[in-house]
From Swiss-Prot:
It is found in: Cell membrane. One of its GO terms (molecular function) is NADH:ubiquinone reductase (non-electrogenic) activity. The lineage of its organism: Bacteria, Bacillati, Actinomycetota, Actinomycetes, Kitasatosporales. This is NADH-quinone oxidoreductase subunit K 1. Residues 97-130 are annotated as: Disordered. GO terms for biological process: ATP synthesis coupled electron transport. Its EC number is 7.1.1.-. It is a multi-pass membrane protein. It holds the Pfam family Oxidored_q2.
Length: 130
């Protein structure tokens, strides 16, 4: 098999994962996109390892060993990441990244701006709302 096929597939997987990280707002979908990017890297590692071992006629397979190590680290990462997302969802009631960022900064995104001073008397405010 030619090296271009897995390299193109790996690039497509990585770009799909990158789009998911940049476009999604749900934390679980972002974690899934990161895993897709890691799998694209693993595919690239294995493809280049096979290609280089055929060219050099060696059977070291260090790329495949590195891929197994990466899979183990990714499994631990997704386990911890999902645990954190579930804990945050239980406490805050949402897993939307933008809403979590706004609540962490201490202000509501849809609320009025509190930096501007109030102008007018109470009678003017009551008249404006009526």
């Amino acid at each position: 098999m030619h090296l271009a096929y897995p390299a193109v597939l790996s690039a497509l997987l990585f770009c799909t994962g990158l789009y998911g990280v940049l476009a999604r707002r749900n934390a679980i979908l972002v974690l899934m996109s990161v895993e897709l990017m890691l799998n694209a890297v693993n595919l690239n590692l294995v493809a280049f390892d096979v290609w280089l071992s055929r060219a050099a006629e060696e059977t070291l397979h260090s790329g495949q060993a590195l891929t197994l190590f990466t899979i183990a680290i990714a499994a631990a990462e997704i386990g911890i990441g999902l645990a954190i997302v579930l804990a945050v969802h239980r406490n805050r009631g949402t897993s939307d990244i933008d809403k979590l960022r706004d609540t962490a900064e201490g202000h509501e995104p849809d609320g009025p701006d509190t930096d501007t001073p109030a102008t007018g008397t109470a009678a003017e405010k009551a008249e404006a709302t009526a």
